[in-house]
Amino acid sequence: MNVYSVIKKPHVTEKASLGSDATNTVTIVVDRDANKIEIKQAVETLFKVKVDSVRTVNVAGKVKRFGRNFGKHSNWKKAFVTLSEGQSLDFFEV
């Protein structure tokens, strides 16, 4: 899988920001077909940081109503990437 197609976007929530402060962990939305090895290689290549571990979660899409009709958001995959000591990753740096 191409390195640029593995990482989709950062998953920025209040809970994710608390985890990043305490354990040096970054939460990222990744491609559903990507495995932990591909995610680790993509983060290390694109952001020039050292990764200690990667944990992944398959998140089920929610059922939503669109007027009278029911629809479903797509399933997606979330990765918790733990960076090495002294490494940092800030998505909002310019």
Curated annotation (Swiss-Prot):
GO cellular component terms given for this protein: ribonucleoprotein complex; ribosome
GO molecular function: rRNA binding; structural constituent of ribosome
Pfam families linked: Ribosomal_L23 (PF00276)
InterPro entries cross-referenced by the UniProt entry: Nucleotide-bd_a/b_plait_sf, Ribosomal_uL23-like, Ribosomal_uL23/eL15/eS24_sf, Ribosomal_uL23_CS
HAMAP family with a match to the protein in the record: Ribosomal_uL23_B
Family that this chain belongs to: Belongs to the universal ribosomal protein uL23 family.
Function: One of the early assembly proteins it binds 23S rRNA. One of the proteins that surrounds the polypeptide exit tunnel on the outside of the ribosome. Forms the main docking site for trigger factor binding to the ribosome.
Gene Ontology BP terms: translation
Source domain of life: Bacteria
Protein name: Large ribosomal subunit protein uL23
Oligomer status and interactors: Part of the 50S ribosomal subunit. Contacts protein L29, and trigger factor when it is bound to the ribosome.
Family annotation (PROSITE patterns): RIBOSOMAL_L23
